Amino acid sequence: MSKIAKTAIISPKAEINKGVEIGEFCVIGDGVKLDDGVKLHNNVTLQGHTFIGKNTEIFPFAVLGTQPQDLKYKGEYSELIVGEDNLIREFCMINPGTEGGIKKTLIGDKNLLMAYVHVAHDCVIGSHCILANGVTLAGHIEIGDYVNIGGLTAIHQFVRIAKGCMIAGKSALGKDVPPYCTVEGNRAFIRGLNRHRMRQLLESKDIDFIYALYKRLFRPVPSLRESAKLELEEHANNPFVKEICSFILESSRGVAYKSSEYSSEEKQEE
């Protein structure tokens, strides 16, 4: 049975499933759909064609699904789709998609968006990600699974961050980040690999292979793109080569350049 505060303003066209909790002074618009077990604390605003997945919890003063902050937006149909078991903290803002993008903003499962996170139109966020306080995503950004982004980080539109990456706090990121990398700075650059996440997701032999692969990719000669092409030719059947090198070759913004501090020996430091 759902529990809905008397002061909540809910459109009769909104769809509310079983076990939903809606707190005081929430505003729920026409096209909103809340799946089982969703919990809205007080003063949450949901508008537009917004779907919230099972057991997602949204905290006070978060605003989801309002008109994209894009001057090209002319009122066309677009969506915001949020998956299951997410925590969306106070004052977060998440916009739907636009005609100029994929017409939707997508957020996967089991993510934590801390206070004051902004997710602009047409972004795609995977699952098991943590976006710390004040993270700002411009439009059309793609973030893979198991990504951590430190507080007060700003990310340029169309940037892609691959699986297992970590972005240090107060970074300004304008280029793509390949799988399992850590980046830091303004403008952010690759500092090394995310050993903590790799140990959680991969076997030791695969971690060794990936470290060796990145050492070869980041040699001064040939270029990064040429190195990626050579690796794909020589290791066509290796899934990690495919994942990492294809990501590099598909980059339109370029890859965050390698720091001189990067070393394949980092893995042995602990």
UniProtKB/Swiss-Prot annotation:
Its main location: cytoplasm. Its EC number is 2.3.1.129. GO terms for biological process: lipid A biosynthetic process. GO terms for cellular component: cytoplasm; membrane. SUPFAM superfamilies: Trimeric LpxA-like enzymes. It comes from the Bacteria. Transmembrane segments: none annotated. Pathway: Glycolipid biosynthesis; lipid IV(A) biosynthesis; lipid IV(A) from (3R)-3-hydroxytetradecanoyl-[acyl-carrier-protein] and UDP-N-acetyl-alpha-D-glucosamine: step 1/6. It is found in: Cytoplasm. Keywords: Acyltransferase, Cytoplasm, Lipid A biosynthesis, Lipid biosynthesis, Lipid metabolism, Repeat, Transferase. GO terms for molecular function: acyl-[acyl-carrier-protein]-UDP-N-acetylglucosamine O-acyltransferase activity. It catalyses: a (3R)-hydroxyacyl-[ACP] + UDP-N-acetyl-alpha-D-glucosamine = a UDP-3-O-[(3R)-3-hydroxyacyl]-N-acetyl-alpha-D-glucosamine + holo-[ACP]. Belongs to the transferase hexapeptide repeat family. LpxA subfamily. NCBIfam families: lipid_A_lpxA, PRK05289.1. Involved in the biosynthesis of lipid A, a phosphorylated glycolipid that anchors the lipopolysaccharide to the outer membrane of the cell. Homotrimer. This is Acyl-[acyl-carrier-protein]--UDP-N-acetylglucosamine O-acyltransferase. The gene is lpxA.
